[in-house]
């Protein structure tokens, strides 16, 4: 099963793709979709949508794991991230890819056993778990891989609980 992890953002969308085969989880790809601050909002969202569709077509994920929008202090940031999530969800719906959402602390628990683990600790763990030579950069891509990893573990647990394995 191929899992696409997404760290949604307005300026930077983190992308992380892993492959789950039996008990093995391997790295496929990580990167970002970036939009310049000087572009009008509608053009930024269009770019996110079009570039994300290219990722979906290139890698054909079976499922998508996305970070839930959580409380943020900056309302403008929250609105931008919400708009970006909207175009990402639209692209996923068009491709009939199921979406699973995870809160940041759920992702941290799945990678460290602790919901308040540091970003550095999570990055080190994702590097180690996926046998990467270095921490994925930028942070948004590392976060997306962590979200995908979380989903791989959660979906495995659901299958075991429901007697599918």
From Swiss-Prot:
UniProt similarity note: Belongs to the RuvC family.
Q: Which Pfam families match?
A: RuvC (PF02075)
**Molecular function as annotated in GO:** crossover junction DNA endonuclease activity; DNA binding; magnesium ion binding
Matching entries from SUPFAM superfamilies are given as: Ribonuclease H-like (SSF53098)
Q: Which gene encodes it?
A: ruvC
Q: What does this protein do?
A: The RuvA-RuvB-RuvC complex processes Holliday junction (HJ) DNA during genetic recombination and DNA repair. Endonuclease that resolves HJ intermediates. Cleaves cruciform DNA by making single-stranded nicks across the HJ at symmetrical positions within the homologous arms, yielding a 5'-phosphate and a 3'-hydroxyl group; requires a central core of homology in the junction. The consensus cleavage sequence is 5'-(A/T)TT(C/G)-3'. Cleavage occurs on the 3'-side of the TT dinucleotide at the point of strand exchange.
**Record's GO cellular component, any one?**
cytoplasm
Upper classification of the source organism reads: Bacteria, Thermotogati, Thermotogota, Thermotogae, Thermotogales
Q: What is this protein called?
A: Crossover junction endodeoxyribonuclease RuvC
């Amino acid at each position: 099963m191929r899992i696409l992890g997404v760290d949604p953002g307005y300026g930077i969308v983190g992308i992380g793709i892993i492959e789950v085969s039996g008990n093995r989880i391997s790295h496929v790809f990580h990167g970002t979709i970036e939009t310049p601050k000087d572009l009008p909002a509608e053009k930024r969202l269009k770019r996110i949508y079009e570039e994300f569709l290219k990722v979906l077509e290139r890698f054909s994920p079976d499922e998508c794991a996305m970070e839930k929008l959580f409380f943020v202090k900056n309302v403008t940031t929250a609105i931008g991230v919400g708009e970006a999530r909207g175009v990402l969800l639209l692209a996923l719906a068009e491709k009939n890819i199921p979406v699973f959402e995870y809160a940041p602390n759920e992702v941290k628990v799945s990678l460290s056993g602790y919901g308040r683990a540091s970003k550095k600790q999570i990055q080190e763990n994702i590097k180690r778990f996926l046998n990467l030579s270095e921490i994925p950069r930028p942070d948004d891509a590392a976060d997306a891989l962590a979200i995908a990893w979380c989903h791989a573990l959660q979906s495995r647990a659901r299958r075991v609980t429901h007697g599918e394995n």
